């Protein structure tokens, strides 16, 4: 059973995972209802989520400085907090690429990838919710395996998307911009897997 002070860390992890999930859902909504003229407004909304996630991470790091005893190793708390924050940062990074690369229309491959990002963030959120019971949880290992499976699915989708992009598109600027966007979408899932593997 976690001590009262331990609950702070687990609640912070849950909040961070929830910010990632909120960011993923927002990105999915933006991409599925794509309107390039509304990206600036969307960036502001996404940045508010990212800032809240950053604040939560700083709270965890500040608490670590003064903590005498922690529920898990300090290094693991810091690393997990960083990975959770990086998921949200990467999701925001996808939106930035859509904006500053001036993408004017959405590609179906990107929608498939963003759907995988949402699923991985949702599963990561469930996994993190089990951490406070890590010694007794019957679901934790299952969530880790499922996240690893989703990451492999993202890798396969990424490879197909890149192949499709490079074999059907002749404009090098379009290839470059989508190459970068697909890569950032795949990074989001990679960091969800890092959370699972920590």
Question: What residue spans do the PLM features occupy?
Answer:
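Cytosolic, long alpha-helical scaffolding segments
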Residues: 1-198
């Amino acid at each position: 059973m976690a001590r009262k002070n331990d609950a702070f860390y687990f609640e912070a992890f849950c909040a961070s995972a929830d910010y990632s999930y909120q960011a993923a859902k927002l990105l999915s909504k933006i991409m599925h209802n794509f309107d390039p003229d509304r990206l600036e407004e969307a960036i502001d909304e996404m940045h508010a989520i990212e800032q809240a996630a950053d604040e939560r991470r700083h709270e965890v790091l500040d608490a670590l400085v003064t903590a005498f005893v922690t529920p898990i190793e300090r290094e693991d708390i810091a690393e997990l907090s960083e990975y959770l924050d990086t998921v949200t940062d990467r999701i925001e990074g996808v939106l930035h690429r859509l904006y500053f690369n001036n993408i004017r229309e959405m590609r179906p491959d990107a929608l498939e990838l963003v759907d995988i990002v949402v699923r991985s963030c949702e599963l990561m959120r469930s996994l993190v919710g089990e951490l406070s019971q890590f010694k007794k949880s019957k679901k934790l290992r299952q969530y880790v395996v499922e996240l690893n499976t989703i990451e492999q699915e993202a890798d396969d989708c990424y490879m197909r998307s890149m192949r499709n992009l490079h074999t059907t598109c002749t404009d090098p600027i379009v290839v470059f911009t989508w190459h970068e966007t697909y890569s950032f979408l795949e990074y989001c899932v990679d960091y969800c897997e890092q959370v699972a593997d920590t």
